[in-house]
Amino acid sequence: MPRTQRNDNFIDKSFTVMADIILKMLPANKKAKEAFVYYRDGMSAQADGEYAEALDNYYEALKLEEDANDRSYILYNIGIIHASNGEHAKALDYYEQAVDLNPQMPSALNNIAVIYHYQGEKAKSEGNTNEAEALFDKAAEYWKQAIRLAPNNYIEAQNWLKITGRSEMDVFF
C-alpha cells in the first residue's frame, strides 16, 4: 500500500491532501507529478524514521525528476539520511551534488561544514593536528558560503569562525 494511503496522523494526512490538490492544479507533466509523489512519500517515510523506505522513494524520484532545483532537494534529503546513519562520505557526496545543482542551498553547505568539523574534531582527538586543521579549514569555507546566503542563520558557526580566527568578516549579519 502506498505511504500516502496509510498516513495515520492528522498532520501527515493534511499535508498529503494539500499536496495532492496542489499537484492536480500544477501544469506539470505526468513524469514530474510521479516524481513529486515519490518525493512526498520519501519525506513522509523519512519523518517517520523509515530511512530505507525513504531512500527507495527518493531514488525513484531521482529517476523521474528533470528539474535541477527539485533534484537538488532530493539529493539533499538523501544526504541527510546517510549523515544520520553515520555514512559521512556518502552524505558529503549527495550534499555536493545538491550544491552543484543548486548553489543557493545554505542548508546543504552547512551540513557539509558540520561533517568536516566533526571529522576535524575526530582527527584532533586522535592527535592528527595537521589533518584536523585542514578539515577545520574546509568546514570554515563551507560555513562562510552558507552564512553569506543566510546571514541570520548559523550563529554557532559564526561564533566558531570568529573564535578560531577563520573569519575575515567582522559581522556576518
UniProtKB/Swiss-Prot annotation:
Would you indicate the residue range of the signal peptide?
none
- Subcellular location, record wording: Cellular thylakoid membrane
TM ranges are: none
Report the domain of life of the source organism: Bacteria
Q: Does the keyword Cell cycle apply?
A: no
Give the function comment from the record: Essential for the assembly of the photosystem I (PSI) complex. May act as a chaperone-like factor to guide the assembly of the PSI subunits.
Name of the protein described by the UniProt record: Photosystem I assembly protein Ycf3
Protein's organism: Crocosphaera subtropica (strain ATCC 51142 / BH68)
